[in-house]
Amino acid sequence: MTAIVGYTDGHTMVLGADSAAVTDRLLIVCEPHKVFTSGAGLVGVSGGLRIGQLIRFQGAPLELGDDGPVPSLLRWIQALRVGLGPAGVLRTKDGIEELADSRMLVGLAGRWFEIDSEWQIVEPASPYWAIGSGQLIALGALHAMASWMAPRHPRAKVTAALHAAAMYDPGVRAPFEFVERPVP
């Protein structure tokens, strides 16, 4: 359970996350560092905390190649698959290799990409996106802000979306953490 929220205004990319770690019967507010920088990108991981730790500390850095963000992400995903295999966090289901119960939100070159557990890359058309159990609440808050709020720094919008998710999703909790990067 979590909320990972990204927003860009075309100048700055901000990625934020809550601090809840949830088990079957327990919610722990901790320092999980669900969002971090990796090379040229911003990365947020929902699902198992161990997967996020492995990607953050042992994963290949995400580098932006001359061929653009999607080919760069494909190379990074392949490097992650090779590196994460020995860690035991990949599984095969119906002949498809999966990242066990996790998804990622990646910011690269001013764009957001969701990478699901089957390594599929989806690029939303909006300048914002969210993943985790608080996804729908955060997306609703971001949509409402985009349509009526005066321009605000992306961090203010991400913070408001995280507060909305924490208010209405029992698996999302403050404090929130943020990483940001200028758009190249």
Question: What is each stretch, according to the model?
Answer:
Residues 97-131:
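Long, charge-patterned amphipathic alpha-helical coiled-coil/hairpin "stalk" segments used as oligomerization
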Residues 1-97, 124-156, 172-182:
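Conserved short S/T/G-enriched processing/targeting/catalytic segments and their helical context
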Residues 155-170:
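Short, conserved aromatic-histidine micro-motifs
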